[in-house]
């Protein structure tokens, strides 16, 4: 089942969820466009400030401004109001997700999911399991976050809800051993995707690096043919702090995608643009609520349209 058939209403929830971000960024852009009678350096400087203050980040903002200046010059645009569509296009171009980004869905694969406690990591694993199951995939979950007492129970609940198998360990068990058992179970059950929930103890990078290193070694020796995906889960409400976390995780793991949770009700949704630009890693999923359907593949057109509220379904 191709996920372009998004459940009706997701766009509306996205528009609603991005209200605070819209108030934070778009209202400033609108007043800028109506407040200037012509395009000059002051106009660009003020636009730059609005975008940076809206959590789009310095690198993405500079790239957007440069792109806009080039297009304005090429198209001989004089009126600020005529820039809005070009600005929207420039922001979309910062966040394009390649079709190959979801290759793991179509091959026998292992998806490591990392993230600090409280960002919605375990919930994301559960929702992903549900989405893959809906697509007809056979899924196994490995509960390798054995350091957090509630993680195993929470994951078990999600596994039951999604109707998928889970391999876990007792609190404090060796995460590597859990992954080893989960690989064996995946092979025995001919699973399409093994989702691994890992501990996100960023405050002790050395431990985390060792743990991920051990998991990777097990996967390389026991499951060498499996396609590998590593997703980092970030809480959009933390804004620039999410970017800092992403950078730190990229020091210890080869991150291939980002999941941004809690996009509903944050004024810092612009971080979705900043992260992709700063790290050259795509945002692959965004979450705007509690249910399985509230986690969806990231679509830059849809996101920016929802941000600017430029179309409705």
Language-model regions, residue ranges each:
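Non-catalytic terminal/linker segments enriched in charged/polar, low-complexity residues
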Residues: 1-100, 106-113, 130, 134-139, ...
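P-loop/Walker A NTP-binding module and the surrounding RecA-like catalytic core of P-loop NTPases
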Residues: 92-95, 100-313
């Amino acid at each position: 089942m191709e996920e372009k058939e998004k459940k009706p209403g997701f766009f509306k929830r996205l528009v609603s969820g991005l209200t605070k971000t819209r108030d934070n960024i778009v209202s400033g852009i609108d007043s800028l466009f109506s407040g200037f009678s012509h395009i000059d350096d002051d106009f660009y400087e003020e636009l730059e400030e609005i975008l940076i203050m809206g959590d789009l980040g310095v690198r993405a903002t500079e790239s957007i401004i440069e792109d806009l200046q080039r297009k304005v010059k090429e198209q001989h645009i004089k009126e600020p109001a005529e820039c809005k569509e070009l600005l929207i296009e420039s922001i979309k171009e910062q966040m394009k997700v390649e079709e190959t980004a979801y290759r793991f869905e179509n091959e026998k694969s292992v998806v490591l999911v990392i993230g600090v406690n409280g960002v919605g990591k375990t919930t994301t694993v559960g929702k992903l399991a549900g989405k893959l199951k809906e697509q007809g995939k056979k899924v196994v979950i490995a509960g390798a976050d054995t350091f957090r007492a509630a993680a195993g129970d929470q994951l078990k609940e999600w596994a039951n809800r999604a109707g998928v198998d889970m391999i876990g360990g007792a609190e404090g068990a060796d995460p590597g051993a859990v992954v080893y058992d989960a690989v064996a179970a995946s092979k025995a059950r001919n699973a399409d995707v093994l989702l691994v929930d890992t501990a996100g103890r960023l405050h002790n990078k050395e431990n985390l690096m060792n743990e991920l290193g051990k998991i990777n070694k097990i996967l390389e020796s026991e499951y060498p043919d499996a396609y590998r995906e590593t997703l980092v889960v970030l809480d959009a409400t933390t804004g620039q702090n999410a970017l800092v976390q992403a950078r730190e995780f990229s020091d210890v793991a080869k991150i291939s995608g980002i999941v941004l949770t809690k996009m509903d009700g944050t004024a810092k949704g612009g971080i979705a643009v900043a992260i992709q630009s700063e790290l050259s890693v795509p945002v692959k999923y965004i979450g705007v609520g509690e249910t399985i359907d509230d986690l969806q593949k990231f679509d830059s057109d849809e996101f920016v349209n929802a941000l600017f509220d430029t179309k409705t379904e």
